[in-house]
């Protein structure tokens, strides 16, 4: 995937691999593609209509996380990144790529990454890179979702934090049955 990097991969229930990537000199939202053959060939490259690639209004993307939840027969994915409109252009044109990076947020997809109808703010202060992991079945972490992110109260680079939550928290009262029904 020329021009992309710092990607996240998720295997879907049908065996396809979903690719979700930052674009270093971005023209917009997150870059996506899929592979039907285990990653040898990537097909259907497009920009997500829903997922930002870092702070909007800049030309530089940001590392984000993506993970598939281990729920049999369903392709529920989570994505993490910044959800901010406060961007400035890079220093070469008088701005800063990090000065207004904020609002670490998680989005949820119920259709294998085609749409992302749910989002939930995790950290409303300065933030930057993030990644996601899920707990394993049969362990104390079962059902938990972990978000590791850069961010603190004053600056994106003053701390690395871990937020732990579950899918119910992400949904914030929305009915999962309704969301799964819309996905099919």
What do these predicted ranges mean?
Residues 1-184:
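Asp-box/BNR beta-propeller blade signature and adjacent active/binding-site loops
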